[in-house]
Amino acid sequence: SVPPLLKASWRLQATSLVLFPFAIVQWNKMDEYIRSNILLPRNLMIILASGVCLFLHFGTWGWSLVNTSLTHSLLFVTAHPLVFVIGGIIIGRPLLRKQSYGALLGFVGAALALISVNNDSEVTLLGDLAAFAGAVAIVGYLSAGRELRSWMPLFLYAFPVTFIAAVLLTFSSMFLEGTGINEISSMSSFGWTDLAWLPAIAYLALGPGLVGHTGINGVLKWVPPIVISVSVLIEPILGTFIGILIGTANFPDLWTLIGGSIIMCGLYLVISAEEYDLVIDTEE
């Protein structure tokens, strides 16, 4: 009964509250040089851009969850390794052979999975496109994190980015979904504070929020974004399995199974090629 943008805003509002005290502690302990660096216009713009990307990711993915099947939503939103490859082609970066094969497999798999649009009443083209837009947005979020996390304290990066995304989602929900401050809890901008919703949102803030997204930001200091993407290979399988168990998803049709398997093989090739490239660079 909770609209998708509102649901996403609740999660990020709660996550922001969890991150805030850690950010205050790091700000007070930080030396003046790093503090002045954070306040440089260029770095503030990167933080803002990262927050906008996180907002777009949660907004488009959340919308896709109610406009296509759970399996399709997870398959397309976790396809961001393919987005890295497309971006590399656009900027003229040479591709490794396995990356090229992986990208080709990914697009073939996507085309096959989209046949389900005509065969499965749950699947829609717009829903799948929205999920893929979420993958594009998360690439910007990861790239911005890689740029700043090499020197910027974890929570001083994660808090403002999450807060910006939460604010944008809250106002977007007001304008697009008709939610507001004084509405019933399922339509209220801060309805997650109601005891009916608090346990679930607290879990999302502490689990996927603090441990998940903030954990990713933590390792971006040492690991390139595309390597982190290896963890996504299990998400469509695990997410669909859980959805079937709790009754929120149907078993995928044949084209989704075939196309999804090919997409995941393509993602594996892209990621393993990048990891191999990193090993070569390190040895040199």
What are these regions (language model features)?
Residues 18, 80-104, 237-257:
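C-terminal transmembrane-helix exit sites in multi-pass transporters
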Residues 19, 23, 95-117, 135, ...:
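Hydrophobic transmembrane alpha-helices of multi-pass small-molecule transport proteins
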Residues 8, 12, 116, 197-199, ...:
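C-terminal-most transmembrane helix of multi-pass membrane proteins
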Residues 7, 11, 64, 90-95, ...:
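Hydrophobic/aromatic residues within transmembrane alpha-helices
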Residues 13-17, 107, 166-167, 237-238, ...:
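Small-residue-rich packing faces within the transmembrane alpha-helices of Major Facilitator Superfamily
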Residues 22, 48-67, 112, 129-144, ...:
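Hydrophobic alpha-helical transmembrane segments of multi-pass membrane transport proteins
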Residues 4-5, 16-19, 84-85, 90, ...:
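Transmembrane alpha-helical segments that form core, pore/gating elements
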Residues 1, 33-34, 114-124, 176-195, ...:
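Membrane-interface helix termini and inter-helical loops of multi-pass transporters
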